[in-house]
Each structure stands twice: as C-alpha cells, then as structure tokens.
UniProtKB/Swiss-Prot annotation:
It is found in: Cytoplasm. This is Trans-aconitate 2-methyltransferase. Keywords: Cytoplasm, Methyltransferase, S-adenosyl-L-methionine, Transferase. It comes from Mycolicibacterium gilvum (strain PYR-GCK). Catalyzes the S-adenosylmethionine monomethyl esterification of trans-aconitate. The gene is tam. It catalyses: trans-aconitate + S-adenosyl-L-methionine = (E)-3-(methoxycarbonyl)pent-2-enedioate + S-adenosyl-L-homocysteine. The lineage of its organism: Bacteria, Bacillati, Actinomycetota, Actinomycetes, Mycobacteriales. The keyword Magnesium does not apply. GO terms for molecular function: trans-aconitate 2-methyltransferase activity.
C-alpha cells in the first residue's frame, strides 16, 4: 500500500525531476495530456497550469494515491499502466518515476509509440540508482539467510531494472520517434535523523514493508539503518548528502 503522506515527505526533491522532464516537452496546444503514475497529484495539477486548454487524465494503481490526487482536484482513476491505451486526442503522455515498477515497460513504450498520432509526445523519467549504496544495502539484506524466504518476490533484486538513457533512445528511435534522452545525478541535501531511510521508505522499501509483519519490519529496519548510516554519513552540521541518478526520455512520434 502506498502512503501519500510518506511519499510527500521530500516533495520538493522528488518534484524537481518532473519539472526538468517537462521543460523538454515542446507541445504547444495539446488536447489531452495523460499522467501515468500520478501519485498524490501534487505534480499532475501543474499540467493544467501550463496547458490550461488541455484535458488532463491521470492514472495510478494505488487507491490511496488516487484519493489524494482527487482531493487536489485531479481527474484521477485507479488503473494499471499496462491496461492504458491512448484516446484519439491524446497528445502528451507523461510518466514520472513509475515505469521501473513494470518490468515489461519497454514493450509498453513501443506499443504507445505505435498507437499515438504523429506529433505526439512521450515523456518519462525513471530512477537510475538501483546500483547505489542504498539499494545495494536493501538487496543484500533481502537476499540474506534471515530474510530471503520472506522476501523472495522483492521487485528490485537485480540492478538492471531500467535501461540506460542510450538504450531508451535506441528503442524509441527504432520505433519512429525523435528522442531526447539524458541522465542526471541530483545530490539531495537531506536533514533529519534517518533521512535516507525515510526517503526509500516511501518508495523502494514499500514492497518490503508490505511483505513483513510489524515485528519483522522493525527488525529489518534495525539491520538496515547502520548500513545506510555508513553509506550516507550525517555531517556535523546535520546535513546528509544523498546522490540520486535519474534517467530522462522525451520522445516525439515523427510526422
């Protein structure tokens, strides 16, 4: 279960890649914009500010996130991105930090590129930090003798969850798109006692939390904390620097 409040703990940090992604989408007067994986809707509603004449459609697989998005005035619905197909007036498809949860997402991108009209845009961003110390620490624990039998379905057990930017560029260029793809590492300045744990608790650790009863979850956290503290030491001034690599792709279906 997704917790919108936990996810929004670092809303400013999580929001910056969204704006960086959309800054490269040069759609002038789109008729319909679709946000796949809209989360709590705090970023989705900015789409209507930029393109006030567009219909904005939002999807998320979490009922809790959809409820939070609707409370912000977003026309959100519960749905799986695998089931989504563009309507004839869809001009922009946006997906922010969602597609890495779908192993077959390259196939979805090819399908969408074939279904969208010429001139339409596909813009997505996915984390590229699955080999970062934070994720390696989680994977090491998940695969340890203590936890492996309880967490055998952990979705990020391998670091090859997403492709590099060049891989997506090749995929969508071959599908008939003009592609702008890049990677950025954000160095987030976090504060608090256990900020990295709090950050990944709202995303990557969610499957672990869902699989474990409370007492096991507390034990797992206790084992993870020193690993994160060693990888991301807190400075004397209270700041913890958290490098986070992200992969961006903006593709336009050719005329």
């Amino acid at each position: 279960m997704w917790n919108p409040a936990v996810y929004l703990t670092y809303a400013d940090h999580r929001g910056r890649p969204y704006y960086d992604l959309l800054s490269r989408v040069d759609a002038r007067e789109p008729r319909r914009i679709v946000d796949l994986g809209c989360g709590p809707g705090n970023l989705t509603r900015t789409l209507t500010q930029r393109w006030p004449g567009a219909v904005v459609e939002a999807w998320d697989s979490s009922e809790e996130m959809v409820t939070a998005a609707r409370e912000r005035g977003v026309d959100a619905r519960v749905g799986d991105v695998r089931d989504w197909a563009p309507l004839p007036d869809t001009d922009v498809v946006v997906s922010n930090a969602t597609l890495h949860w779908v192993p077959e997402h390259p196939d979805l991108l090819l399908r969408w590129a074939g279904q969208l009209r010429a001139g339409s845009w596909i813009a997505f961003q996915v984390p590229g930090n699955f080999d970062a110390p934070s994720h390696r620490a989680v994977r090491d624990l998940v695969s340890s003798a203590r936890w492996a039998h309880l967490l055998r379905d952990f979705p990020f057990e391998k670091s090859e969850v997403v492709r590099p930017a060049a891989g997506y560029a090749e995929l969508l260029t071959d599908a008939g798109c003009t592609v702008d793809a890049w990677e950025t590492t954000y160095v987030h300045e976090l504060t608090g006692e256990k900020p990295v744990l709090e950050w990944i608790g709202g995303t990557a650790l969610r499957p672990v939390r869902a699989a474990l009863p409370d007492h096991d979850w507390q034990e797992f956290r206790a084992e993870l904390i020193p690993l994160l503290d060693a990888a991301y030491p807190r400075r004397a001034d209270g700041i913890t620097f958290f490098p986070f690599r992200r992969i961006f792709v903006v593709a336009r279906v050719k005329n």
